[in-house]
């Protein structure tokens, strides 16, 4: 059955592409595979040097020339050139990045599903996925499970980056750009020899923008503004006739905004009073007006060393990496509609918060909010005071929402030693060992807004200006041990067989750092998990064998058939301790949702099969590849977001079983010298087969997975004079309809279902049920255009990002028991100019 689905999906993809063939052709990478017959692309994604056309897997490669002509710097940009891959990044904070490859998503607050490898070194912090990694020279995106090569965080694939390596001549470059919204970018690098056999690359970058959106209440562009700078250094030295030492260091600093969300309600039985209570997420008009300026800070430092020694028959490679990423955010809260700070509880802190809430509501009565929300004469929820009450929604201009302060701090030390045959043999092999230690602290603090701003401490006593009402704060420790090996055997000159195996052991533990303290607003502990005493430490070990089998058969000199199968693995882990108690008290006991959330979430395991053909024709002027795939995922990790009277809660849950299958087709044609047409289509089908956490979702699609992606484009390089060319580049990306939650065409009870029977409206519980059929992001297309002139060592380029100003959603986070979704807008049109010089 699995094979039938795979071949059906492959055929569907081919038919769909054929229909579009009259409009445009495609290319293997959606970006570049080199200048056809003239260039041979060498890739390293499988830990060995291979010709692109010989790799027995789906892989996208962006060369240095393509990176320069597309203006690509970070993952959110190169993902748009890669079929079957989507990304959500920066909606909550800069380090909040989720990459989805063929239906396998990296759940927020869990480990990534995609390995990030930079200059041969594996990085483990998801916060680094969308960072500028230096002066890039090649990007490779390898699809399908790569756990046998890279281990625990490569279930969906691997992103392999190569940066500039110093040579024996002085070279350098600078590039600056200016665009709308006060957006400026500058980058520079210099590569110089320091002596015989030793060289240095030093690079830096700077980026600033006011962003697309404005906070109307504060009167400032503080919704998606950002400022980033970074510096990278790399020294490569020959310390012996067969030994190379590669040392790198990097520092980056980011500051800007966070939590760029509005809320949309999905309560159909309220639509008679106001149609906006049942709002399609795609129709929402975005307005921002929180009274708290949202902030986001991120500091990154990392240093690594890699040594390579070539013996007569084998090569020894060893590396070590230290990485430290500290992140924090402040923002408005979400508690106004649940009256956490509305009524005094007999403490000075609660009286002060209630007074501030009533005063700010009275001062802002009638202030225009996104419908159906409104500010009435009092902050009492509308259902309890229909004549004078309010429906605020989250992030209102009043103080009734409270505040939030979050930290995510991770330091890790990792190392690997590997010995491999020297290649170009009938039988190649490699063996290695890997170790990783992670220290991670995660804190989420909710406080009362007394109109005096946020104190950047996780716990603030009741007498302060920002007293804490709820706190999750935990210390997570992880140790990973792995052994791996692979063999590649040339069975015949046309038939290659590869076998790989990796065994990972991951020891995880968690300790609560929440102090024993009383919540001045509820009288209970500040963490619900402390209701029956201190939260005990927990530990768990996760283990997984990850095999991989691949084969390649040369049908002709220009066409290869390939197939591969492998196991992917993501370790289980711990939510903030006390999460299960919150969900049980607030939802299961109150409205009977019976959603299953645990303080421990299970490991994710996937089994994936892929088969395809890739090749070239017309003396290399036409390249193509066609692939079909099938993946079965057990215990898929999924991010859930809860809001209520308790504040907000972020957790990872498990979907018991998901099936994904689909097809992908890429084609690239050089029409004449200097004119390329390219395009690609990916079609993905998915189905939830079992989900004990939310049984009604069985039959729905895998969350965060687009039904399809289409890439179309062209590049023209035409000589204008003897010394310079005109360059035109157009890239059009269509992303298909996407569900972001397991609840899709489903009804679900909400907190309103529990509150309405006892409210002033005295309505039956079902009136508060939500309908989530209107939470699917619709398909959208984004056109990026670049036009300019380039000489041997200079370029001037005008560019348009999202040329047609297509409005779309970046992310939809459904808060199922709240009765709505938190939605974040995508980028708008931005025009600019770029100038570069190299020597």
Language-model segment annotations:
Residues 96, 112-113, 125, 134-137, ...:
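Outer-membrane beta-barrel translocator/receptor signature
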Residues 1-72, 76-82, 241, 303, ...:
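N-terminal Sec signal peptide and the immediately downstream disordered periplasmic leader
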Residues 304-311, 315-333, 554, 560-566, ...:
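Membrane-embedded beta-barrel scaffold of Gram-negative outer-membrane proteins
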Residues 236-240, 419-422, 428, 432-436, ...:
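Structural signature of Gram-negative outer-membrane beta-barrels, strongest in the C-terminal barrel
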Residues 213-222, 259-291, 332-405, 445-473, ...:
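Solvent-exposed loop segments that connect transmembrane elements
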Residues 37-169, 611:
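Acidic, small-polar-rich N-terminal luminal/periplasmic segments of exported/outer-membrane proteins
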